[in-house]
Amino acid sequence: MEFNLNADKEGWISEFLASRRTTRDFSKQPVSPELIDELLKDFLTAPSWSNTRPFKVAIATGERRDRLSAEFQKRWSVLSAALRGNLWKKIKLVLRWDGLPTSNWSISRPYVAELRPRSQRVGKELYEFIGIQRGDRKRRDEQWGKNYDFFGAPVEMFIYIHKSLHIFAANDAGLALENLIL
């Protein structure tokens, strides 16, 4: 999608923001370190609490990115097999925790009741669009596994926040990420 930015046109920012989309398949073309640096400059212009920018960025490209992806995919393979397995496989997974990387924040909470229908609708539309039936667990797992290949993106960025600042640092990182994405 190409966007013709005309800042002289009234409502251009709303039009630009409405053009946002999600990408699930990236080109393998490498991104130059100079372009990454330019994007990080924009990333760092976001406001933050006391202008402290309580986050760090780790960037993986090339062989390092591929090693991380391979490790994440290996863990996803173990986790998805255990989730489809019997109770013993699930207990073994919890005891060994050969699953996905951990986080300071729980990301597996269920949506609140009023948001759940929208979440389910969007998920259903995505899987219908890419031709995966609800009952096709194998293809659904394969599609989910693409998260751990970063959807083929040649650059992966990991954002780390200062845990002592709790949600405040996460908010600040979110603002910076919006700059990066835009």
For each feature predicted by the language model, list its residue ranges.
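Acidic, surface-exposed loops and disordered segments
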Residues: M1-L182
